[in-house]
């Protein structure tokens, strides 16, 4: 490796995101990269020329090991959506101007789907303009929904947390004196992918029967059928625990959380901020 490397972190930090950073840094150094830069606060910070020489901060093997176990995102993060090339050419010219100044051979971005969108746009521009820089996406998402990736770094720890939390909730529901007729609906992250909600099944074991029902966004949701199934379970059990993805939709494609209130806020990538699915369902079966 003759040229320099730059690496950034983007999106929500996972417990493994700094391990990926440590791996990128160590591999780049081992392959002979003269310098390994870290962009501060992702591509948004890079546009303001905020970056550091990582060798000044990661000085030995102990620092690498400590970085692996450091929480949050060591370099800082962002949720900045790159415009399309035809929408704002100046943004791309600025980015590639900085890359040329730093003599960057490889640009590595640690993140999920939106971060891969950034990598694709930069790669497309480089191909069109004939730049030799390589743009590489390093997978990171608790949603486990990156194409061609079996288990994304970040998913395992999130799945373990959900399974453990669900087991505690289920055990609590059976030890409460007033639990007869109690229905607990646990809303889990997952707009379009149900991997996290599915992980609630990890609660099942010798000491726990697991959630009674699990609803994921890959299948359409029927609120009437849900109410009837809860009622049927309560005829056999003193309490019911259900796991639902925040992004479950009815057959016509409407988010269940929007049945009660409209969702107005969207992020930089146009994603609606979903919340209230469990609250709506709780009110529905109670009413």
Language-model features: where?
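Gly-rich Lys/Arg/Thr-decorated short loops/hinges at beta-loop-alpha junctions or inter-strand turns
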Residues: 2-7, 67-81, 140-150, 180-182, ...
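Glycine-rich oxoanion-binding loops at beta->alpha junctions
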Residues: 49-105, 114, 142, 153, ...
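N-terminal phosphate-binding or glycine-rich loops at protein starts, especially the Walker A/P-loop
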Residues: 1-52
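Short glycine/serine/threonine-rich phosphate/pyrophosphate-binding segments
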Residues: 14-24, 46-47, 83, 90-93, ...
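Accessory alpha-helical/coil subdomains and C-terminal extensions
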Residues: 36, 98, 106-111, 117-132, ...
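Cofactor-binding loop segments of dinucleotide-utilizing enzymes, especially the Rossmann-like FAD-
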Residues: 10, 41, 112, 138-140, ...
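Short glycine-rich or small-residue beta-strand-to-loop segments that form or flank ligand, phosphate
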Residues: 4-14, 73-79, 105-111, 183-188, ...
């Amino acid at each position: 490796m003759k040229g320099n490397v730059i690496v950034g972190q983007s999106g929500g930090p996972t417990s493994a995101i700094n391990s990926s950073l440590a791996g990128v840094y160590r591999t780049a150094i081992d392959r002979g990269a003269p310098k390994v830069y870290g962009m501060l606060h992702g591509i948004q910070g890079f546009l303001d020329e905020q970056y550091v020489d990582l060798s000044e901060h990661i000085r030995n093997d102990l620092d690498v090991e400590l970085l692996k176990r450091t929480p949050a995102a060591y370099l800082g993060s962002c949720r900045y959506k790159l415009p399309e090339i035809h929408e704002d050419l100046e943004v791309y010219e600025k980015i590639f101007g900085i890359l040329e100044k730093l003599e960057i051979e490889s640009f590595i971005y640690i993140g999920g789907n939106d971060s891969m969108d950034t990598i694709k746009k930069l790669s497309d521009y480089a191909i069109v303009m004939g730049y030799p820089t390589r743009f590489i996406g390093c997978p990171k998402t608790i949603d486990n929904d990156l194409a061609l990736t079996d288990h994304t770094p970040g998913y395992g720890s999130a799945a373990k947390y959900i399974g453990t939390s669900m087991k505690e909730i289920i055990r609590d529901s059976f030890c409460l004196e007033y639990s007869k007729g109690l229905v607990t609906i646990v809303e889990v992250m997952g707009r379009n992918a149900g991997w996290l909600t599915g992980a609630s099944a990890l609660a099942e074991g010798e000491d726990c029967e697991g959630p009674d029902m699990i609803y994921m966004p890959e299948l359409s949701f029927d609120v009437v059928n849900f109410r009837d199934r809860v009622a049927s379970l309560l005829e056999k059990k003193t309490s019911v625990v259900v796991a639902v993805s925040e992004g479950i939709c009815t057959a016509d494609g409407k988010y269940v959380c929007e049945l009660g209130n409209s969702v107005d806020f969207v992020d930089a990538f146009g994603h609606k901020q979903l919340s209230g699915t469990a609250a709506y369902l709780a009110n529905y079966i109670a009413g």
